[in-house]
């Protein structure tokens, strides 16, 4: 069920906050012997996103060079899939140290992230790429404002919420619009791409990697 604004205080990071989100210091991501954390560089290709607690399973994610919710990214989202920007103004690939950015529509194009707000702290996020499953744990929710350059910098930072801080772990930001909440509050602002002012961001930390299961033969 969509969360009213303001979002849950225990999970939300206020717009403009500079707080870094860190996993417990002693817990490095557990790994099976075979898969390794991906090396630097552009993602090899499309991958999938699953968030069981939000009913999201096998959502196709298309990497592209750019930044969150720019025109190329919005065009990808309009296809009913998710977009993942990389490069100088984007994020990193699955399993890499830094911030894996994923955005998709909540209401239009089939609403693939319609129930993203239902995901809570402690819930599992599965990213499958190149035969490897990267398991992230949601650790926080934050609100991004498209009308605040600072807020956008915090969303896109290598360490979510802390622009300029060097990343030391693999993290993920999954973002979708807060259109219902904005409209309920009387806020009908939108940008050139039709994005409302606010977005709901779920932030996670990589906990383990494992081999993807081989498909069952029919």
Regions inferred by a protein language model and the residue ranges of each:
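Solvent-exposed, non-transmembrane regions of membrane-associated and secreted proteins
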Residues: 31-129, 137-218
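Short glycine/proline-centered loop/turn elements that form peptide/ligand docking sites
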Residues: 133
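Secretory targeting and sorting signals
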Residues: 1-31
């Amino acid at each position: 069920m969509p969360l009213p604004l303001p979002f849950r205080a225990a999970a939300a990071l206020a717009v403009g906050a500079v707080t870094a989100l860190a996993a417990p210091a002693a817990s490095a991501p557990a790994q099976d012997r075979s898969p390794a954390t991906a090396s630097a560089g552009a993602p090899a290709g499309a991958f999938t996103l699953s968030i069981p607690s939000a009913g999201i399973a096998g959502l196709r994610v298309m990497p592209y060079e750019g930044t969150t919710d720019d025109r190329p990214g919005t065009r990808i989202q309009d296809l009913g899939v998710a977009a993942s920007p990389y490069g100088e103004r984007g994020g990193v690939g699955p399993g890499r140290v830094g911030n894996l950015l994923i955005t998709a529509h909540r209401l239009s194009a089939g609403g693939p992230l319609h129930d993203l707000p239902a995901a809570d702290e402690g819930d599992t996020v599965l990213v499958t790429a190149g035969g490897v499953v990267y398991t992230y744990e949601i650790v926080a929710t934050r609100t991004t404002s498209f009308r605040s350059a600072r807020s956008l910098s915090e969303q896109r930072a290598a360490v979510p919420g802390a622009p300029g801080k060097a990343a030391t772990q693999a993290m993920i930001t999954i973002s979708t619009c807060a259109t219902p909440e904005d409209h309920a509050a009387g806020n009908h602002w939108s940008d050139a791409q039709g994005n409302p002012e606010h977005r709901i961001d779920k932030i996670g930390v990589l906990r383990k990697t494992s081999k993807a299961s081989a498909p069952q033969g029919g």
